[in-house]
Amino acid sequence: MSWVRVNKNKPCPICGKPDWCSVTVDGACRCMRVQEAPGWKAIKQHVDGGVTFRPANEDTNEYKERYRPKPPPVRLYDWRNIQDELYQASEAATRKQLAEELGVRVIALTALGVGWHEKKEAHTFPMYHEQGVVVGIRMRSRSGKKYALPGSKDGLFGIFDMSYKSTDPILVAEGPTDVAALLDLGFHFSVGRPSCRGAVGILKKLLKCRDVVIISDADGPGVDGAKSLAHSLIGIVNRLKIVVPPENDVREWRNKGATRDDVQLLISNTQECKDAGQIQSITSE
């Protein structure tokens, strides 16, 4: 039942007072002052005070409050241990096969902590929050289907030592395979979002007072997500740029021959985003 407090305009139908008591739209009344009332039948005495009444002329079937099952206990996952097991299960040949499929070197996948789920026959990518703790596992099946293990929370792909101070900007890409491409190109301070609009809260904590380059996918949703993130980071980060690669995403660009110098040149030639107007002017064209 959804209880509504009585007021001066709609006082308690039992005691006539404008406060303390409550009613429901289906005719029940919880009166805080009266134990018995003509024309009403008491159906529950509350230990914290008051009596719930129903009209005495209702259906002869005894009214019972709707059963509310207790919520199931929250299951706690030891993601660190799960990640370790999945990582150990990934044989060199399995990781090499994925590296060839993605067009990156095995070392980049190793840096991401890529593992293998034998039962589901899927590659695994750990997701982290801003303090470097594993909060979930993203799966990638042999067919390319992407999903997360039950209980996972969205986090970032890739993590680095935040205590290490560098003049290099932190690169933020979309998804684990784009981060793999950036790592393969030598951009070691790179992380990936779980989606084009995911992990904003984590990034706001991670990127505070840092130089940041958002590497957007070149489609509409990718650019819109990058712009949305940029709006959230203005005033939090030090310097901010949004880079849109000439191909669909940075991994495709890498596979078509882009080098670290190519990416660095694009970043250098991209105007810094200092206000909302500059962010909004960015397009996927």
Region locations from a protein language model:
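Alpha-helical scaffold elements adjacent to nucleotide-binding pockets in ATP/GTP-utilizing enzyme cores
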Residues: 30, 228-232, 249
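TOPRIM metal-binding catalytic domain and adjacent DNA-binding surface shared by DnaG-type primases
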Residues: 1-32, 43-135, 156, 161-167, ...
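Residues within well-ordered alpha-helices
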Residues: 94-95, 105, 178, 202, ...
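Short phosphate-binding/catalytic loops that engage adenosine nucleotides
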Residues: 186-188, 237-238, 245, 258
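Conserved beta-strand -> loop -> alpha-helix junction used to position metal-binding or nucleic-acid-contacting
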Residues: 242-252
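Short, surface-exposed amphipathic charged segments that create phosphate/polyanion-binding patches used
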Residues: 205-209, 251-264
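Phosphate-handling DNA/RNA-contact segment within nucleic-acid enzymes
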Residues: 117-211, 226
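Conserved catalytic cores of soluble enzyme domains
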Residues: 8, 35-37, 44, 164-167, ...
